[in-house]
Amino acid sequence: MAGNKRKRSNASEGSDSQGNERISSLSANEATQDFPRGGASSLTPLEYKEAVLEAKKDFMESASGTAELSKKTRPKKKGSKKSSKSELDNEENLKVHIQSLRYKNITPGSLILGQIAQINTLDLAVSLPNCLTGYVPITNISDKLSDRLDSIDNHAEDNAATEEEDGLNQIPDLMDLYKVGQWVRVSVTALGSENTTKTGKRHIELSLKPQDANGSAPEAADFVAGSMIQAVVSSIEDHGIVFDIGINNYTGFLSKKHINDFPFVEGQSLLCSVISKEDRIFHLSLTATSTKALEVMPSVQAILPGDYINVLVTDIKESGVIAKYMGVVDVTSDIYHSSPVKGEDLEDKFQLAKSVPARVLFVIPGDPPKIAVSFLPHVLTFNFATPNTPHPDQLDIGFIVNAAKVTYVSSSLGVFCDVGVPEISGFAHISRLSDKKVAGISPNSGPYKVDSTHEARIINYSYVDNLYILSFQQSVLNQQFLRIEDIEVGQFVDGTIAKLIPQGIVVTISEGINGLVPSTHMADIALQFPERRFKVGSSVKCRVLSTNVLRKRVLLTLKKSLLNTDLPLIYDYEQATPGTQTVGTLARIFEDGAIVEFYNSVRAFLPVSEMSEAYIRDAREHFKVGQTLSVTIVSCDPENRKMRVGCREQSWDAKRLERFENIKAGSVLSGIVLQKTEDSVIVDLGDKVTGVITLGQLCDGDLNKCSKVMNKLRASTKLAEVLVLRKDTSKKLISLSLKKSLVEAAKENRMPINITDLKEGIKYFGFVRNATTFGVFVEFCDGLVALVPKAYISEEYVPVPSAVYKPQQSVTCVCLSVELSQEKAFMSFKPLAQKQEKAVEFMESKYDIDNPVDETIKKTYDYVAGKITWAVVTSAKASQLNVDLAANVHGRVDVSEVFDNFGEIVDPNKPLKRFHKGDKIRVRVLGIHDSRNHKFLPISHRVSPKQFLELSVRPSILNMEPFSMKEPQFKKGDEVTGFVNNVSKECVWVSLTPSVNGRIPILDLTTDVKELNSLQKHFFLGKAIKCYVVNAEDSITLSAIGPLQGFENLTPGSRLVGKVTNVNEAGAILQLPGHMSGRVSRIDMFDDYDILPETKFTRNNLVGVCVLSVDVPNRKVALSARNSRTQSQPVEIKDKEINSVDDLKIGDICRGFVCNVANQGLFVTIGHNLIARVKIGELFDTFIKDWKPHFHVNQLVKGSIVGIDNDSKRIEMSLKQSKIKDSSEITKTFADIAVGSNLDGTVVKVGDYGVLIRIDGTDNIVGLCHKSEIADAVVLNISKLYSSGDKVRAHVLDVDSEKRRIALGLKSSYFDSDSDISMSDNEEDVEMRSEDQSDTSESEVGSKDDVQSEEVENLESAGDEDEEEEPSALQANGFDWTDGSTVFDKLADDTEDSEDEEDEEPKRKKSKSDRFDDEEKDLDEIPSTAADFERQLLSSPNSSLLWISYMAYHLNLNELQEAREVGKRALSTINYREEDEKLNVWMALLNLEVAYGTEDSLKEVFKEACAYCDALIVYEKLCGILIKGGKVDLADEYMQLMLKNFKQVPSVWIQYATFLLNNDKAEKAHGLLERSLQSLPKSEHVGIIEKFAILEFKNGDPERGRTIFEGLLSSYPKRLDLWNVLIDMEMKQDDPSIVRRLFQRLLALNLSTKKAKFAFKKWLAYEKNIGDDEGAEQVKRRAIEYVSESHSEN
């Protein structure tokens, strides 16, 4: 670059002195900095830019002058012409031209910033700069979307029938992927015409694929923070979106916090902003992450459309602005994008040499590339994924602007106009100014000068340019339609026939808009030769049926019935109102109706019953598709887009409606025949009310006689007597009959209308409704039907009733019986054996009454609803009174029908206590009590002695006049009285009335937990409960503790009962009455913090609580379960309740739970919203550098209050033992410590000199154990043996009373002489073992460290070491720490093999393993104290057995969290090579969480275990643990996960199938085989099928196993191994016949001699085993025959 600048200075020697001075100084400066140090320039940026501009100007002037001089004076020489041309080219190349995007200068590979203007079915229309439009085919959006389209295409070819059923096999809707106005970066892929004709429009094909839109060969280095990048949604994850950015080995990631509810779809291509780059991941955003422009790009190729950059203005012209980026890259902005105000003087807006922000608009490839930028505000500030907000005054396309004022004229482009919309201008291209050719335009003269006004029409809108595209052409102004959106449904349009096609007629409506007249809409009748009636080029008047903007389709009609109708048009479901009459076209016809189509694809269903007044059997026989009908809307459901119409007259006047209402079924009327159809007669009954007589109802004879009657009838024939059979009020249909037998019966009032009219033993006239195999159905009036059973049809046997009795046939029958409760009646065609009168008398005798209590009652049917009578109590039960109304009439009084309100009840536990046997009581009859179903039934027929009466003695019922049987209506908040009738675990059911029950949830029963824990004892049958209605919509829900339970009704101090729904170490969530929930924090669970939550708070447990506070707006309730809060009697409080700072004073000792472990210290919750801070210096009496491992969240700590700030409510706390110890806790003083004694202590510091130990039970007395006294062997690294916080036992070596110093020793030899180990104060109840069982010799520690590296090397070189056998029952409180023996234990079958291998190991290896014999003995005998465990772990840190035993030790002490911590320590301590040892610890942790943890904690441990161990083994082990623990459902979930993640492993399928079959889920297991075959390779198919078959034999259905094996053998008949397995399975089924058949089939195959010998030998062994000697002999004979036959063949 320095060389170039020196060249420029030399070329400008002829310029003015000032310019020379500047250039020379710049050159001198550059000459001194060819190799600058640090890259800093001595010029300021502004001075540097001014110098560059001045140098460029002088160079251009000098170059121009030299060229002119050489051209005039230099003589022509050979080659001078070429030289001159080269100089002109150089001069032209130096000029920077303002780039506008035109079709001519676009090349494939050009990158452009655009906005989506239109979304079509198969492509996107993208608005480009300079009023251009390009199209992105659906195949150019992304590779992922293209692959999906390919799969859809392949699926359609394979199985077209299922394509509609599978939603995944439908073409994606681009409307779900993009929005109009959304910004995108596109790459030009092809240029051409939409069709091959000369008038074809220019077509620009674009691509949104990242590999195209991010440059030809995008590299990761080209994108920096703030760069724009086009990315494709690759997958949608829980934490964000993964993108494909088109760069190999790099991906993009959009965090969930940057999503902002944007709808993401896989395969979607979006424009994003780069936030940062980490490793191979670009962090993206959909919004601008910074308002700061990009100052520097990695390279020129990195500049892409959409990038927000700062450019330096170098030149301002009338047509635009020229600028530089980074001082070397030329960029331009044309008049479209230089200023939003067209006609504005650009020199007033831009200043030379000033840096301004701009956004890159397009990049056209070249050398150098042509780069354009935009300064328009809406381009600078856009959001990438969401469209810009439309202008509130935006005009529609097609709108005519009466006075568009010209504001700027571009002689080469056109004119810019003010259309009256702020911030949006209009632009009319020069070709759109007039229908005639415009030679030229000028801003100062002519018809299109500045400030001239014109009538203009908006023909489009350019999103990127923010311009309306205008046309001044008169032809466009006069054009009726510009777009399909301008065409209204139902509108009349004039068009010209363009062509005739098989589907119909294509009509040109306007320029570029065609419509189709379907063949069914050419005329009201079907045309065989439409070309004779319609000629191409002729004008037609049409009506618009529907429009589809997306598919660009307009449907028209030429039907005269639709063109000339004056009826209202239906083009929207919302517009359709019942009763409206309109015209429609039949689109489809079915047997039971038809689909009628109106305008805008609105459709309705026309039932066959609404097609005509006459009966129509099949609509297809009377109507044709395309037929026009006048219909009336019957009903419409706009929400579900359903409509029902009818052809029958729907509008009835009052007189006609009154006539219809007065006609009753069973009445006899007169009428006049209106018309006849093929099989019916329509009769006028007066006032335009009509009825229908079907053919079979014309007479009592058969169909032939009925047809003769039909032939005699004529229109206007008077019918004197017709019977009304049925009346359908909803359809306004009346069915009539002319059968004389029915008419006469109706006239004599012997025609039954409802089932109560039927009397047993009475003869009735009817007609056959239907004949079936079991009897004949007889119909009477109003649809009443009775059954004649097959046995009562005739005296003779009738095998097929339908052969004798035909529909509509007249019959006479006798009533056998009537079942009113089931509304059934039975008839007989047989004659009565006795006279009818005797039969009636016999029937009446059934209702005789015997010795009634009320002597006014004569018959049982005198007991009707509302009857007040007397009854005698026979027994008083808990929930009802049993009474007698007569000797043969009984009843009951339900307890809910005794009292009017709860106040009348003397003893709620025994409400019926005042009633005694023999009491005579006044009762009122309510109905019938169905004792079988325990239901209340109203009285709808005569009461018989067999029925049980439902009675009432409630005063309000006895005094009710007039009596009404209306059920009481319950509403929310009502006070009611309920009587217990049933008790379940979740609720108590109470009776409110004999027929209405209510439900009281268990939490709404009482606030006494004891009562709820023994429901049956306190809520027994019949108990009265005062309740309040909570919900009465679907079922009645009640509450016995208050009227309306809600957050507003809760008050602090209220005592409730809650049901535990979730519990963890921080607290518990409880369900409260009234569907509320509350939280009990850890400090509010107990008055003693030592009690674990699990002792009281387990899921579904009931707990008494007290309300502490209620946050009504946020629906939060704080609760307390402390006994001091929930119980009235005083209780012992160990940890007092602290409610405010006022409850504390400095020096108070209190306990709390750690809520945060921060870098500054601990934060401890000690009360309600009270958190105390513990500084690091207040944690321990001595300094401990790594203090965090000593604390964890929810840990219980004890401390002393050292500071209180009442104003800020801040509390300071100290955990130092010296500040919180009571005098009673200090058991030793300095004087009590004697030389030679053994003491327990805690390591407080480890240094090079030794270990500092704080002695337990003292006032912070610390002793020193010198490094020489740590172990009997030399210890090189003390920190490997001890760390701060370790519990140790030390021997006192020396005591210096003056200096208060104590010398201690930790050597194991100091403890050898002790025959009895003293116990610490806190371990008095723990039985200690003798010295040879409890302590591992400390001398072993040093020796093992010395040989550790040697042993590791030997182990690695020798291969696998002997495996330790896992303990089978390391238990704590009955808890098995191992995974036990399950179907997933892969090593179970190899135990004996491994033992054999151990015996064969070389002696060298065995001698090496002998080194660990002592350690094994120690591990087998588990230590008893934490100190013992810590000592042994020093010598055996890799022993999983010891670590698990340590966990069990803590669990025995109910220290659940400590057990977890030990497990975590074990995982971090055990050497990474000891994979089996680590796996054992993981299994122990999983066992722990399964037994004591939650599902969330189990899931967390499981995920960690999968990350560090073989995931498949962890899955199998966990499933085995869950199965053994009885958690089958959870095991099923994890098995399904295992199957999903390891579906290529055959054993996983077998394990899951085994589990399902063992747990009675055979149907689910049967589907696994087919699924496994789809996932496993073909080489595994035979094996997996065989194993599934074996499973069926062992655990499932043996028959299914046989079927599977038979399928295998049909494919592999000579696979002896398959035959062998099948025979083995059948041998276990104990059916010798099946086994023998299998052997016979096997030997019938062409087997080799060796295979046949094997088969005979196996068969013979089987016969001997089952003890069948004859069978064995037969096998031998068969073998001899087989051998002889084989020899003869050979």
Swiss-Prot record:
Pfam families: S1 (PF00575), S1_RRP5 (PF23459). GO terms for cellular component: nucleolus; small-subunit processome. The modification Phosphothreonine is found at residue 1391. Residues 11-32 have a biased composition (Polar residues). GO terms for biological process: rRNA processing. Keywords: Nucleus, Phosphoprotein, Repeat, Ribonucleoprotein, Ribosome biogenesis, rRNA processing. It is found in: Nucleus, Nucleolus. Residues 72-83 have a biased composition (Basic residues). Residues 1348-1367, 1390-1400, 1412-1421 have a biased composition (Acidic residues). The modification Phosphoserine is found at residues 1394, 1684, 1686. InterPro entries: HAT, NA-bd_OB-fold, Rrp5, Rrp5_S1_rpt_hs11_sc8, Rrp5_S1_rpt_hs1_sc1, S1_domain, TPR-like_helical_dom_sf. The keyword Isomerase does not apply. One of its GO terms (molecular function) is snoRNA binding. Residues 109-209, 226-289, 306-376, 398-473, 490-559, 579-648, 666-739, 761-830, 866-942, 973-1044, 1053-1122, 1147-1216, 1236-1307 form the S1 motif domain. HAT repeats lie at residues 1420-1452, 1526-1558, 1596-1628. CDD domains: S1_Rrp5_repeat_hs11_sc8, S1_Rrp5_repeat_hs12_sc9, S1_Rrp5_repeat_hs1_sc1, S1_Rrp5_repeat_hs2_sc2, S1_Rrp5_repeat_hs5, S1_Rrp5_repeat_hs6_sc5, S1_Rrp5_repeat_hs8_sc7, S1_Rrp5_repeat_sc10. Residues 1-42, 59-90, 1313-1424 are annotated as: Disordered. Component of the ribosomal small subunit (SSU) processome. Involved in the biogenesis of rRNA. Required for the formation of 18S and 5.8S rRNA. This is rRNA biogenesis protein rrp5. The gene is rrp5.
